[in-house]
């Protein structure tokens, strides 16, 4: 049976739910993906699965998280490797959530030249946007975003 299992590794994240409570979880990520490297937390959150298996870092309990109810997932940065061919565009922004909480940081993305405006990035169908907060990255669920303001 072990030969049928997909190899996974754990990634620690700090998740904030709609109630504002932040908790640490370990998510299970695949070692190989279609983009050629290991799966990242952003890949998992922007993927098709609604419930994500995780381990609560405080209680060591196995739990299944409803992806749509994750407001913010904070991970160690950076999100991806930067190379000389695909330098990201970066904009300093303030993201105000529907609960009134404001987050500040950089949105950093690589899009085709013909659709590389901030609004193009925000309207991408992926449910989470990435906000660089110094050494960490906040993956913010767009369902909970009230507005994004350029600074």
Indicate where each model-derived feature is located.
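Conserved RNA-binding domains used in RNP assembly and mRNA/RNA metabolism
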Residues: 1-151
């Amino acid at each position: 049976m072990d030969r049928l299992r997909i190899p996974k590794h754990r990634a620690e994240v700090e998740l904030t739910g709609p109630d504002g409570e932040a908790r640490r979880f370990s998510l299970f990520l695949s070692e190989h993906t279609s983009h050629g490297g290991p799966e990242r937390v952003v890949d998992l959150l922007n993927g098709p699965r609604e419930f994500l298996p995780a381990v609560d870092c405080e209680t060591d309990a196995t739990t299944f998280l409803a992806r749509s109810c994750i407001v913010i997932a904070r991970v160690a940065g950076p999100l991806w490797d930067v190379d000389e061919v695909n330098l990201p565009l970066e904009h300093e922004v303030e993201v105000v959530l529907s609960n009134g909480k404001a987050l500040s940081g950089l949105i950093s993305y690589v899009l085709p030249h013909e659709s590389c405006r901030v609004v193009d990035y925000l309207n991408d169908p992926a449910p989470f946007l990435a906000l660089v907060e110094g050494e960490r990255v906040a993956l913010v669920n767009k369902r909970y975003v009230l507005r994004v303001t350029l600074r």
